[in-house]
């Protein structure tokens, strides 16, 4: 169970970072 939880947390963190980077690039391109 802890392994699945940690994997889910890692997946969530990775998706959050990817989204943040994508939004940052979009803002830079808009500017």
Swiss-Prot record:
It is a single-pass membrane protein. GO terms for cellular component: chloroplast thylakoid membrane; cytochrome b6f complex. One of its GO terms (molecular function) is electron transporter, transferring electrons within cytochrome b6/f complex of photosystem II activity. It is found in: Plastid, Chloroplast thylakoid membrane. PANTHER family: CYTOCHROME B6-F COMPLEX SUBUNIT 6. Component of the cytochrome b6-f complex, which mediates electron transfer between photosystem II (PSII) and photosystem I (PSI), cyclic electron flow around PSI, and state transitions. PetL is important for photoautotrophic growth as well as for electron transfer efficiency and stability of the cytochrome b6-f complex. Belongs to the PetL family. This is Cytochrome b6-f complex subunit 6. It comes from Acorus calamus (Sweet flag).
């Amino acid at each position: 169970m802890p392994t699945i939880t940690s994997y889910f947390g890692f997946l969530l963190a990775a998706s959050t970072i990817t989204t943040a980077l994508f939004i940052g690039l979009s803002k830079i391109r808009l500017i």
